[in-house]
Regions:
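Extended acidic/polar, glycine-enriched regions
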Residues: 119-121, 182-273, 685-686
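Active-site-adjacent substrate/metal-binding segments within catalytic domains
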Residues: 41-71, 75-84, 88-104, 157-166, ...
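Substrate-binding clefts and catalytic carboxylate motifs of secreted carbohydrate-active enzymes
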Residues: 4-5, 11-20, 152, 390, ...
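Short flexible loop/turn segments that cap and initiate beta-strands
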Residues: 193-198, 239-246, 647-649, 655-657, ...
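Edge beta-strands of extracellular beta-sandwich domains
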Residues: 260-265, 697-709, 811-819
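Accessory beta-strand-rich segments of carbohydrate-active enzymes
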Residues: 2-19, 36-39, 54-161, 204, ...
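Beta-strand-rich binding/interaction modules
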Residues: 176-216, 225, 648-666, 688-693, ...
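Short, hydrophobic beta-strand segments
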Residues: 114, 227-236, 679-684, 778-795
């Protein structure tokens, strides 16, 4: 079977439901693009968009993608299919005027059969209408268009259907592993066919084993063929050592190869139970988890493989060993990256079932679409060793009802039938699941915790109903709410049918659930970042607690303002333009680690050295808004020009017993650590601020901040060589650093980026959560001293020359080599 990338030479134009008339009148503007392509990121944001803050004020729309191609005569009589990994929201696929399919799930992969509609030896027109015009339809930034890759499949008379080679680790013993391999072989022939199915398993290019079976296939027959192997001295896959193998399954007719399917997989066992937690190859692993959305920051939703790999690599380097695909099936490139870096995956079905959260969301189609979506999801995930959990839903509104419990049971059972090797969960939110019980629960909470009047005699400074609900999910109120008997009643139906009990913002139940369900593992499927000390203590002290997933690991577009610090009286969740990002990730929109990330790494036990963070001095004396998702508005910087003599609030994060802080060599005293933190008030003086940790009286780590002196612009690319495939990408960080390597995070600079040569300037932007700058223009202002340019390779070899001009004066240049693409 031919399996090839089908991403090149597309055109896109904006539609409005009347594309034929617009084309006739010449009212369209077409652009040639290389997929994946997100059309939403190129739209102008407006305060009055129907999506509001949910998408960061980006509007949706209808987009018409077209591609002309020639179908060789040799394809005639063969199975010709097109695989679309993701088109948002609704996709209508036409070939030469024929409607091939309508797909309603913007996150689900789908396949169309093209053969009967092709013109062989002639020009063909493939048209995809990506309709994201029914708004609002999502609680976060979705992107629009064909934002994931497209593949072409051309099958011979006998072939291996996509995703039908399955490799299962049955047992791992001392020096061996038992594997079961199954393959579905399909005959499209009108006569009996005699073929050989040959299996080869390789590790790092060296064959480990080879086997074959001879088959006699009747016309049109589909057969499942099984192999069983014992692999000697296997290199096992684990988060710490993610060894991968390659399976090559060939269909041979004599010496002719009719088809070939290559599958990367890992040899590992998986078990989850209340006594031992998650075990990979018999070893217990606590899940250090990050919830992530699918966008790639300033790229929007375009799923470039290099962007997905970069994101997973950065999360792993920050101490995470697991991600949750929130709230939809993960893309293939993301799963591939997780396999390579040893990051475990909770793959998720949907944010809604049959009750809407937005007027035009997936709830409109869920009942008729969930089963094929699960089938495709499992087929996609099965051979990925990183995938360990299927999450059937997120904060489902009907979870506390009888009908919701029954839906949960059907979903979990379907996952188990299709994949008995993995486990199911549901990310349950108490506020959503409580349903009709919520009024009574809230009454009990308010009687237990009477409202405290604010300074003006009001309700705490004018907090609205949303803030009142949010307060139920944190602190003592949150624990009382979480453990309320009526909430236990509401959650019981879904909890009974899941393998793992998943809880969103219900920390008070993490221990209680073991009393109620002693044989079930429990997981914090979504939790507040600032609660990591308490959360991780519960995880470490309780075998049934298998891990914690923070919201969120990486900042993202949409849900704008959830974590933005308002010092002007503004309130979070108030849909304030031009807010664009949630601003609550451990890593910011560009992938820079924020102070909460280092605290988390210390709490995890992965970092011995202390870490220093300073509250933004320009906000001294000011009071900000606050939500449970927010940590502190601080930076790891000792460069605060114009604030000499003013008091800086300095946090030291450390796992040591005590720390000592030094300013320009003078001790500011030792302090015992409380919840991994010690806070100092320090008069700001430029120079050196150093923290030293002590345990048992001995130094066990130190960390130093220095004031930046005469910082100069630097350009740092994560890659200097790209393939000329139209999809490779380099991420260029633009910072201002002095001769000692100290970055100036304070001074703002206006940047202009220019590119010449064999590539495309795909995006330019900063991590500023509240900016009107576009990401598809070459200009940007730094935020916290940083900006980023994303360079995408073209389809011809050559060089890319990048020039960045700062403040209309200083220039820096960078060259990236574009090599011929590998076949």
């Amino acid at each position: 079977m031919i399996r090839q990338n089908f991403n090149a030479d597309w055109t896109v134009e904006k539609g409005d439901g009347n594309s034929r008339m617009n084309s006739f009148l010449g009212n369209t503007q077409t652009k040639t693009v290389h997929l994946p392509y997100d059309a939403m990121i190129h739209e102008a944001r407006t305060p009055d968009t129907k999506n509001g803050a949910q998408t960061g004020f980006y509007p949706g729309g209808e987009y018409i993608f077209q591609k002309h191609f020639t179908a060789p005569q040799a394809w005639q009589g063969k199975l010709v299919s097109l695989v679309f990994e993701g088109v948002y929201q609704t996709a209508l696929v036409y070939l030469n005027g024929w409607l091939l399919t309508r797909n309603v799930n913007g996150y689900a992969e789908f396949t169309v059969e093209a053969g009967p509609y092709l013109k062989y030896g002639a020009d063909n027109l493939l048209k995809v209408i990506a309709d994201n015009s029914l708004e609002p339809n999502s609680r976060w930034y979705t992107g629009s268009g064909i934002y994931r890759p497209v593949r072409l499949l051309v099958g011979n008379k006998v072939y291996l259907p996509q995703d039908t080679v399955r490799i299962t680790t049955r047992e791992v013993g001392q020096g061996f592993a038992l594997l079961d391999v199954t393959a579905q072989v399909q005959s499209a022939s009108t006569v009996t066919e005699r073929v050989t199915l040959q299996q080869t398993i390789c590790r790092e290019g060296t064959a480990v084993l080879t086997d074959r079976q001879n088959l006699l296939l009747q016309p049109g027959e589909s057969r499942t063929v099984s192999f069983r192997y014992c692999v000697d001295s296997p290199a096992l896959w684990s988060p710490e050592d993610p060894n991968l193998y390659t399976s090559t399954m060939q269909v041979l007719e004599g010496e002719e190869e009719l088809d070939r399917e290559e599958t990367r997989f890992g040899i590992r066992t998986l078990s989850i139970d209340a006594a031992h937690g998650v075990r990979i190859n018999g070893q217990t692993v606590k899940l250090r988890g990050a919830c992530i959305h699918h966008d790639n920051g300033i790229l929007g939703a375009a799923t470039l493989p290099d962007a997905e790999e970069r994101r997973i690599r950065q999360l792993k380097e920050a101490g995470f060993n697991a991600i949750r695909s929130s709230h939809h099936p993960a893309g293939r490139a993301l799963l591939d990256a997780c396999d390579r870096y040893g990051v475990l995956v909770m793959d998720e079905l949907s944010d809604v079932w049959n009750v809407r959260k937005n007027p035009y969301d997936y709830a409109l189609y869920f009942e008729q679409d969930w089963k094929p979506t699960i089938q495709k999801m499992v087929a996609k995930d099965y051979n990925h060793p990183s995938v360990i959990l299927y999450c059937v839903g997120n904060e489902i509104s009907e979870a506390g009802s009888e009908s919701g419990a029954e839906t949960n049971r059907r979903l979990c059972n379907t996952f188990r039938e299709l994949d008995p090797t993995r486990y199911t969960t549901n990310a349950l939110n108490g506020l959503m699941a409580a349903g009709y019980r919520l009024r009574e629960i809230m009454g009990d909470v308010m009687r237990k915790f009477p409202a405290q009047p604010g300074p003006s005699g009001g309700d705490g400074g004018g907090s609205n109903a949303l803030n009142s609900f949010m307060s139920l999910m944190s602190g003592e109120k949150g624990d009382y709410f979480a453990t309320h008997p009526l909430l236990t009643e509401a959650l019981s139906g879904c909890e009974d049918s899941c393998d793992v009990i998943g809880l969103n913002y219900l920390t008070g139940r993490h221990v209680l659930e073991h009393e109620l369900h002693p044989h079930k593992a429990v997981l914090g499927t979504e939790t507040y970042p600032a609660d990591i000390v308490r959360l991780w203590r519960i995880v470490e002290e309780n075998p049934h607690m298998i891990g914690d997933f923070t919201w969120a690991g990486y900042d993202y577009l949409g849900e704008a303002g959830c974590g933005i610090f308002h010092y002007d009286g503004g309130a979070n969740f108030s849909s304030i333009y031009p807010e664009r990002t949630a601003y609550i990730g451990d890593l910011d929109l560009l992938g820079n680690r924020r102070p909460i990330s280092y605290l988390r790494e210390i709490v995890y036990g992965l970092r011995k050295a202390p870490y220093l963070a300073v509250l933004r001095m320009e906000r001294n004396g000011q009071t900000s808004s606050k939500t449970p998702w927010m940590f502190k508005d601080n930076l790891s910087s000792w460069t605060w020009p114009d604030f000499e003599g003013q008091t800086a609030s300095v946090d030291v994060y450390s796992a040591s017993e005590e720390v000592e802080l030094f300013l320009n060599g003078a001790s500011l005293g030792r302090r015992a650590m409380v919840d991994f933190t010690a806070t100092y008030s320090v008069p700001y003086t430029p120079g050196e601020l150093k923290a030293v940790g002590y345990t048992g009286g001995l130094c066990d780590g130190e960390f130093t901040l220095r004031t930046a002196q005469d910082a100069q612009m630097t350009l740092t690319a994560d890659r200097k060589t790209l393939q000329a495939n139209g999809e490779d990408a380099a991420f260029v960080m633009i910072q201002f650093v002095d001769a000692n390597g100290t970055a100036d995070l304070h001074t703002k600079h206006t940047l202009k980026v220019e590119l010449e040569g064999a590539g495309i300037l795909e995006a330019v932007g900063s991590a500023n959560p509240c900016s009107e700058e576009r990401y598809d223009t070459p200009e940007s202002e730094t935020f916290d001293g940083c900006c980023m340019a994303v360079i995408r390779a073209g389809e011809a070899a050559g060089e890319i020359h990048l020039t960045v001009t700062a403040d209309d004066s200083v220039q820096k240049q960078l060259t990236i080599l574009i090599q011929e693409a590998e076949c």
